[in-house]
């Protein structure tokens, strides 16, 4: 039986970063130093344990979030290694939804990069406490203090260096622990397994004293109890300092910052120490809140085995044709053979197997407890975002919101045999990744897949071939658009029809008006049940949302519209759910056609890092692509250019940028919003 003490010694963390910050290398070192793996897997050799998919090993990037468990200082640490590429941001989002803490990895050369900001804000969205690791201190151009300054400028939480580097670039030899006031160095002959504390060299003592004093001052500013001791001049113990760091980290006031070089096996063990010392256990996070799906009353679950079961399905994977569901258990317990209730679907299911995962390897267990992340076999109906609970104590947790795709591609099966396999394969891929959308076009007899970026689509097509042995012809990528309206209109529709022996009556009056960018379709009822009985309001809203799936210009979904139900009528004995749904959908569609509809295109946030000598050419090219410059930041011999550019204008940009800068510039992009074409 998992006890309360075990809960306090459990950590659920994610390792998140911008692509190429060294995130997976950090995770591989963690597995090696905790004894979980007996060989260091290297990303550049395609041997990283956590990057187990063939596509990950070939490209040297993480595509899917991988789960593992290891031990450190008598604590059990569940780790999710997440992707850094923007096309797979949703993998990070759904991982952070179920995690209690995060290790954010930064590159000492690049500092705060675009995807670093994205994952940081995603963690903030779910109130996830963080520790930061500034990696690659051995690289040319590495600057720990510049990276910390960038963190301070870009984020709400205050970065608190608890270490500073000893040396930099090729002379990076260790770190100084500002809490213990000791130098920490690693023995390269043991691959960094062996490390020691020693006295701080005299030449760096003044710098150490300065940064230690800054650390203590910041803690005193944020914690009154600590401030009293600090201002009185009392002797501050390591325990005093560490307890205050933990307290202010859990309250999201600070982010402890460390440094090292994971590839050179320096600085990783202190990350584990920080995870144990400063990041929360399941007991430290607020109770989970949900609603009772039957009564709509609020339900609360604290992290305890004695509470009724509450778990969230956050990931689906195919395992040799069998469905495997990843769950975060917030309360209660799970056992093999147990019957559970899917509150999202209103269906009962049965646990066939419980598995603890280590990347793509697994260990069968008979029981799982509150606070754990576990894989389950046997849940055929469960989808990502569903709540699993006890039928006698139902609870519905907040589901996971998924991003809308911005790019699509037409595919068609090469042979009739491939056609038979294609639909099944795409269904399974959509079940795994809800950001994949599939649509069949009758006119062209083509299947159109939509995703988050060109790499995302490339991976989907590669997986169709490798995992499902399905051969397809592929069209060129194309942009996914949206539609909206520009003016306010009032519209009225009456549906009256006899179907069989029953009359169907539905009558609604709606007001449609433009809404802020970045929103969907909002439904507001401005009448009460005396005009139209409340039992029909759900059908009216459903009819509007279904009609919004296909616009009146080119058939793209309608967004950024506020719909008010302002009137209508009711006829006793003839009113029906179907009639009100049809009337509302028809009114919405006709209203949009009269409200000056326009097309919206996806706009991307683009971040270019270029040698300063090419800055003018890069900016000129962005303007030529209808882009708007947001900021230009000089960083020594290079410049960072931030811009917003239509996605349509960015096809082939990677090749053009390389040509314009002699291959010396790099860029990244992520979705901003849909806006006027």
Identify the residue ranges that each predicted region occupies.
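Structural and coupling elements of P-loop NTPases
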Residues: 1-677
